[in-house]
């Protein structure tokens, strides 16, 4: 058995490969790492993997905590994957490839697996990232605040109270009639409009039509305001990790 962990800014996701069969195990919050509860949450108590692979954008303290639990439970040291200049036939667009986030790189590899079509990848997590691939080459991307960061910024830098966002918003039209709805709907439309406009401009600039793939904890909230159809893949980064290991 192989075990894969994706350690993001707020969650830990896991998957396994056993006898060639891939299985996504779900996600837990960071608290489960510090307590070691993620082993039980993912039903890994009785497993004896031959290798454990990690993709992480988390602080070093969390990486160390995850590593310690893995070592204690599985009696082996995890392999931390990193961005490469090229892998699985895909070329990284960053000249300094080591500065390109490993989460974005793995998402690209997962999204482009088995496809030669131009691909537009949106990861709506704590930060919202966008990347594009044409003819197996990553042509670049953007990073902007995610929905949560936008909403937190309004709370921290204005007179809005956190309580005002806890209240259930009731809307009978497009525009909000209370503070919660104003913040929730406004930030949603900001990101949705940004993605819609960016994709239009990108297709005009390149003369290509893109297949669109979305992932991340907030993507399903964004999907209703997006103009083009997106394929949602919850475990996209883990699937990219799988591609890396199978290419070795």
Swiss-Prot record:
Family to which the UniProt record says this protein belongs: Belongs to the type III pantothenate kinase family.
Annotated residues that bind substrate are located at 94, 101-104, 179
Residues that hold K(+) according to the record: 123
Query: Could you identify this protein by its name?
Result: Type III pantothenate kinase
Under the heading NCBIfam families, the entry gives: baf (TIGR00671)
PANTHER family to which the protein is assigned, alphabetical: TYPE III PANTOTHENATE KINASE
**GO (cellular component) term, any one:** cytoplasm
Cofactor(s) listed in the protein's UniProt record: NH4(+); K(+)
| GO BP field | coenzyme A biosynthetic process
Query: What detail does the entry give on cofactor binding?
Result: A monovalent cation. Ammonium or potassium.
Q: Where in the cell is it found?
A: Cytoplasm
Instruction: Provide the residue positions that the database annotates as binding ATP.
Output: 6-13, 126
Q: Which residues form the active site?
A: 103 (proton acceptor)
User: Could you give the subunit structure recorded for this chain?
Assistant: Homodimer.
Q: In which pathway does it act?
A: Cofactor biosynthesis; coenzyme A biosynthesis; CoA from (R)-pantothenate: step 1/5
Q: Which keywords are on file for this protein?
A: ATP-binding, Coenzyme A biosynthesis, Cytoplasm, Kinase, Metal-binding, Nucleotide-binding, Potassium, Transferase
């Amino acid at each position: 058995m192989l075990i894969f962990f994706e350690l993001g800014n707020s969650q830990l996701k896991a998957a396994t490969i056993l006898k060639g069969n891939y299985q996504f195990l779900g996600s837990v919050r960071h608290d489960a790492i510090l307590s070691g509860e993620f082993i039980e949450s993912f039903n890994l108590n009785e497993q004896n993997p031959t290798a454990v692979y990690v993709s992480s954008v988390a602080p070093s303290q969390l990486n160390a905590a995850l590593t310690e639990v893995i070592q204690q439970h599985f009696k082996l040291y995890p392999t931390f994957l990193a961005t490469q200049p090229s892998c699985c036939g895909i070329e990284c667009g960053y000249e300094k490839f080591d500065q390109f986030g490993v989460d974005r790189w793995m998402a690209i590899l997962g999204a482009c697996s088995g496809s030669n079509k131009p691909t537009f990848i949106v990861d709506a997590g704590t930060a919202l990232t966008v990347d594009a691939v044409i003819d197996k080459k990553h042509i670049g991307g953007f990073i902007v605040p995610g929905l949560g960061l936008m909403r937190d910024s309004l709370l921290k830098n204005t007179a809005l109270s956190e309580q005002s966002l806890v209240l259930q918003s009731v809307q009978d039209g497009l525009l909000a009639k209370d503070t919660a709805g104003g913040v929730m709907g406004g930030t949603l439309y900001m990101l949705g409009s940004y993605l819609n406009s960016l994709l239009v401009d990108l297709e005009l600039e390149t003369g290509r039509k893109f297949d669109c793939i979305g992932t991340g904890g907030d993507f399903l909230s964004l999907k209703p305001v997006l103009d083009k159809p997106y394929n949602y893949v919850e475990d996209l980064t883990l699937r990219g990790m799988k591609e890396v290991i199978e290419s070795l």
